[in-house]
Amino acid sequence: MSNGYGDHMDDVCRDDIGRTNLIVNYLPQNMTQDELRSLFSSIGEVESAKLIRDKVAGHSLGYGFVNYLNAKDAERAINTLNGLRLQSKTIKVSVARPSSESIKDANLYISGLPRTMTQKDVEDMFLPFGRIINSRVLVDQATGLSRGVAFIRFDKRSEAEEAIASFNGHKPPGSSEPITVKFAANPNQNKNMALLSQLCHSPARRFGGPVHHQAQRFRFSPMGVDHMSSISGVNVASSASSGWCIFIYNLGQDADEGILWQMFGPFGAVTNVKVIRDFNTNKCKGFGFVTMTNYEEAAMAIASLNGYRLGDKTLQVFFKTSKSHK
């Protein structure tokens, strides 16, 4: 179950009798589950309230579910609380649907957007394809300006597929360049786990060719560089507190930590970089790791850098999973 609420949804019916389970979107990031329950209890008796959190990092995903004992209370909650302004958010309240395969993996990554487009502009652009569960436009923390990148989660995967078919390669109003629309990176992709497992249990790999520094494109930050000159194996920790660990494969022999800082720094906060080196030669074995604090910034980096050519190498970039430790 990808969204963590299947147990609460299995018995929900589509008719009026079962319209007691509500989905609440666009919740403030710091809102707690108790606060969610308290808000909706002001309308009527609440059977259960669940704030959906990331299973690994533990942070709120910005939506939750409230199940009333009485369908009339649920209807009144929609009429009363839908559109309520909480902090900087305007929440959306509607009847939830039963869990099914059709709602899995409906999260889109959009890049190349005009920097002037707001979150509402992006939603209005994609709204014709279906119900939007939540959205986010990434902004530069220093300037507050849009990075031209957004994430949109649709209600159904089929809606997301329609959006991709219609808008990938499309030029939105006010833009001279086409945008990229594709499914956001999934940190649990089986093929990623298989490749990483193979790398971690295989002999040292050798890759030739120089790494060309592209200083005009990337920002370099030497702070916190963790040199791996004496590492002989892979043992990179990943936990909710340490952030999101990204695996980079097919680096050249001369790749160093500075290159990784330069590549990933523009996408968000990087807390650690590691280049895995051969114990005897101190050359890069062909892969490394980057840890970022924010999932969506990490996903943006993956979407942008996977397939990127560094020197004469084409990089493979994806989330490292917990199963990769074994």
From Swiss-Prot:
GO terms for cellular component: cell cortex; cytoplasm; nucleus; ribonucleoprotein complex. It comes from the Eukaryota. PROSITE patterns: RRM. RNA-binding protein that binds to the 3'-UTR region of mRNAs and increases their stability. Involved in embryonic stem cells (ESCs) differentiation: preferentially binds mRNAs that are not methylated by N6-methyladenosine (m6A), stabilizing them, promoting ESCs differentiation. Binds to poly-U elements and AU-rich elements (AREs) in the 3'-UTR of target mRNAs. Acts cooperatively with cribp to stabilize AU-rich sequence (ARE)-containing mRNAs. May play a role during gastrulation. Required for the vegetal localization of vg1 mRNA. The lineage of its organism: Eukaryota, Metazoa, Chordata, Craniata, Vertebrata. This is ELAV-like protein 1. PANTHER family: EUKARYOTIC TRANSLATION INITIATION FACTOR 3 SUBUNIT G. Keywords: Cytoplasm, Developmental protein, Gastrulation, Repeat, RNA-binding. Belongs to the RRM elav family. Residues 20-98, 106-186, 244-322 form the RRM domain. GO terms for molecular function: mRNA 3'-UTR AU-rich region binding; mRNA 3'-UTR binding; mRNA binding; poly(U) RNA binding.
